[in-house]
Curated annotation (Swiss-Prot):
Its EC number is 2.3.2.27. GO terms for cellular component: cytosol; nucleus. It is an enzyme of class 2 (transferase). Ubiquitinated; autoubiquitinated. Autoubiquitination is enhanced upon poly(ADP-ribose)-binding. Residues 259-359 are annotated as: Disordered. PROSITE patterns: WWE (PS50918), ZF_RING_1 (PS00518), ZF_RING_2 (PS50089). It catalyses: S-ubiquitinyl-[E2 ubiquitin-conjugating enzyme]-L-cysteine + [acceptor protein]-L-lysine = [E2 ubiquitin-conjugating enzyme]-L-cysteine + N(6)-ubiquitinyl-[acceptor protein]-L-lysine. This is E3 ubiquitin-protein ligase RNF146. The WWE domain mediates non-covalent poly(ADP-ribose)-binding. Can form homooligomers. Interacts with PARsylated AXIN1, AXIN2, BLZF1, CASC3, H1-2, IPO7, LIG3, NCL, PARP1, XRCC1, XRCC5 and XRCC6. Interacts with DDB1, DHX15, IQGAP1, LRPPRC, PARP2, PRKDC, RUVBL2, TNKS1 and TNKS2. Binding often leads to interactor ubiquitination, in the presence of the appropriate E1 and E2 enzymes, and proteasomal degradation. It comes from Ailuropoda melanoleuca (Giant panda). It is found in: Cytoplasm, Cytosol; Nucleus.
Amino acid sequence: MAGCGEIDHSVNMLPTNRKANESCANPAPSLTVPECAICLQTCVHPVSLPCKHVFCYLCVKGASWLGKRCALCRQEIPEDFLDKPTLLSPEELKAASRGNGEYAWYYEGRNGWWQYDERTSRELEDAFSKGKKSTEMLIAGFLYVADLENMVQYRRNEHGRRRKIKRDIIDIPKKGVAGLRLDCEANTVNLARESSADGADSVSAQSGASSVQPLVSSLRPLTSVDGQLTSPATPSPDASTSLEDSFAHLQLSGDSIAERSHRGEGEEDHESPSSGRVPAPDTSVEETESDASSDSEDVSALVAQHSLTQQRLLVPNANQTVSDRSDRSGIDRSVAGGGTVNAGVRSRRPDGQCTVTEV
């Protein structure tokens, strides 16, 4: 059996109310709280990194922002460690949430309140009982100022970011203690990293965003262009025609119907056979639409026929006007010459063809 001298106990690890020579009286050593190498104090809610080094949870949190590595061995800290920390004593967290006194101190988070850790709560309670207007706190490597008059806290070097604090009873609903959630289910959810060193809850609303269904765009009805069904994203076959031709086609559609009423159904040419002009292909709007509706019609032929139809709709009025002017000019020349004069008047059509009218 090992003697008292063989047990390696330092005086600093023993409680303060015990002497060194009394260590042999009770050979069973008491559990000691490890010290944090970052804040140089006893660990509050100690956590163990994958490298087996132990620190305060908030100290690891503050150090991970400066560099995601262990403060001692420089081994990398996992990304999800702050969301799923390895606590050395999980029961200590539940005991801290129940508290030892009647009141506790809280700071504001999103959708709830967080309870301060025991050390910070003692400092706040001591300053409040002494009637101080403010006190400083070291949290996660940052110095915070607690304004006990306005009940807010802020970083000493950044006064713009303020957070509400309050002193309330110990058993109010809370989110957790010092950034550690009390519910076990929250540890299984991959939460976003918190934005402040004091454990403020800044979880982004990822679940809300995932539940929002994407907007379903309503489909526009298919439109018919020359007998072909086209969607809004599909270009029409007559996309090469100009806007003026389309506008003229709409304006002259009423005139063409009126002309058909006194020319007769099926009459498309306005000139007589004796005009001497080479007749154009006998195509009508109805024929163009019927040809375009067939699947075997080529797209280029459809465009050519469509443009030719538009030109033919513009020709009758122009030819009639030119013929009237030619007749009048021929009559004037015959009267002025005192006899019959055969004058050939040439008029130019929009499609480049010329018509000769004999007087």
